[in-house]
Amino acid sequence: MKNKPDDRKDNVDKIQYNITKTIQNCELADEMIAKTDDEKTKKTLIEKNERRREALDGMREEIKDEARDKKNGYM
């Protein structure tokens, strides 16, 4: 069986797409938090957004790494 080559050409685009979607989800959750009176729902959404923001930090670091590697020719 032949291994697939490491094709990383579109990694930056994929990561950027995930960042955009995560930000949209945070914004939607913030809207729901503002509209709901259910404290349990608010707490759950706040916790999810905290995890999303942590994930965003990681994705931003990853995109920097990928952009640097792309510039250096994926060595």
Swiss-Prot record:
UniProt cross-references to InterPro entries, sorted A to Z: SASP_thioredoxin-like
Region feature Disordered, mapped onto this chain: 53-75
Pfam families membership: Tlp
Top-level division of the source organism's lineage: Bacteria
Family of this protein: Belongs to the Tlp family.
Name this protein carries in UniProt: Protein Tlp homolog
Protein source organism: Clostridium botulinum (strain Langeland / NCTC 10281 / Type F)
GN (gene name): tlp
